[in-house]
């Protein structure tokens, strides 16, 4: 039986700005199982990074947690003091950020940047920390580790810098690794290498990963489960196969249709319109204004999470037994035929 290591319940986070309160996170519920990879996907501004940073308590000073809990190993992180969090960050929960150059101190040799984490959290001697740092660099694929520990970040390529950041994150064998778009700043070849490295290290360290990205192609390669976020909410969650091949929410349809595939015609689909202003979120389903299959109820009442399967849920009124049939995009029908087999039945 799987073991839940991290649980987010009814999380609501607002940001106080001169223009008013931005409702960035509007009731997020998520669970992370031990050893699994959960991908958070969605457009910019959907709440992916804010959700992840709230787990580390790394939100800016104008952030206000209005409601909810984040339970890690049976304790609510939101009730922890900054001193308590300093012993959790880097040791039990680690994070890899998008741009490796801004994650590393340009004035400090990379060896010291790795060893200071080990010395702080593991209470190791300098010699023990240096030995561990060498092992970590070799583990993440940096050759001549002993010599390269004496070099500065600018002496490494972008891909190598990201490997170093991963080495720092893994220095204390964390239970959870949060990877916030860790391959966005890298070219496609290096991106594939970093993803393969993360998969290998996950098996070796038996850690759970929250993988944040807007690239669905990346998700297919790394995730066990996927949570689709829109306007500060999770609108669909399921296994990677369920979300990719039997998607239920119109927003998930739009994301998948906008992915180039071998079946893509001359024009690539783009979701019409823009995400809503979270200073004043719309009533009902926030995606209704951009959806060509929106129902009348979408504009007045927010949909609950409907169960598609024991592992698959989606917040769309289209799943209500009373909902009318709506036309399903050709690309989604093609994916469902793969999921169910030709002629198989899926919800319309």
Model-based region annotation:
Residues 2-5, 14-27, 58-64, 80-84, ...:
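A short, flexible loop at the N-terminus of ABC-type nucleotide-binding domains that lies
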Residues 4, 143, 239-344:
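Short catalytic/signature loops enriched in Gly
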Residues 57, 178-182, 186-267:
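P-loop NTP-binding/switch modules centered on Walker-like glycine-rich loops
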Residues 65-76:
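Conserved ABC transporter NBD signature motif
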Residues 76, 128-147, 256:
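Conserved ABC ATPase "signature" region
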Residues 77-94, 120, 242-247, 277-282:
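ABC ATPase NBD coupling module
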Residues 171-175:
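A short, proline-enriched helix->beta-strand linker immediately N-terminal to the Walker B motif
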């Amino acid at each position: 039986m799987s073991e839940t290591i991290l649980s987010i319940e009814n999380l609501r986070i607002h940001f106080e700005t001169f223009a008013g309160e931005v409702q960035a996170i509007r009731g997020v519920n998520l669970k992370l199982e031990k050893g699994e990879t959960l991908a958070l996907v969605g457009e910019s501004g959907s709440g992916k990074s804010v959700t992840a940073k709230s787990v580390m308590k790394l939100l800016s000073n104008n952030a206000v947690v209005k409601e909810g809990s984040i339970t890690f190993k049976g304790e609510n992180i939101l009730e922890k003091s900054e001193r308590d969090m300093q012993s959790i960050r880097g040791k039990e929960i680690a994070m890899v950020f998008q741009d490796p150059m801004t994650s590393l101190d340009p004035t400090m040799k990379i060896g010291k940047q790795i060893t200071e984490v080990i010395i702080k959290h593991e209470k190791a001697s300098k010699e023990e920390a240096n030995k561990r740092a060498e092992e970590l660099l070799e583990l993440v694929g940096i050759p001549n580790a002993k010599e390269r520990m004496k070099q500065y970040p600018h002496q490494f390529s972008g891909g190598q810098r990201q490997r170093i950041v991963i080495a720092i994150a893994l220095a204390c064998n964390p239970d959870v690794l949060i990877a916030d778009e860790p391959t966005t700043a890298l070219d496609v070849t290096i991106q594939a290498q970093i993803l393969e490295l993360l998969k290998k290290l996950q098996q070796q360290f038996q850690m759970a990963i929250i993988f944040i990205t807007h690239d669905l192609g990346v998700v297919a390669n790394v995730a066990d489960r996927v949570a689709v976020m829109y306007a500060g909410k999770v609108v669909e969650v399921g296994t990677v196969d369920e979300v990719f091949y039997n998607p239920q929410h119109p927003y998930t349809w739009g994301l998948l249709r906008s992915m180039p595939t071998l079946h893509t015609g001359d024009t690539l689909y783009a979701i019409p319109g823009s995400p809503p202003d979270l200073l004043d979120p719309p009533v009902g389903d926030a995606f209704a204004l951009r959806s060509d299959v929106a129902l009348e109820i979408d504009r007045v009442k927010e949909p609950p999470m409907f169960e598609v399967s024991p592992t698959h849920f989606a917040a769309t009124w289209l799943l209500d037994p009373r909902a009318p049939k709506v036309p399903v995009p050709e690309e989604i029908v093609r994916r469902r035929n793969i999921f169910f087999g030709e002629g198989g039945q899926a919800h319309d």
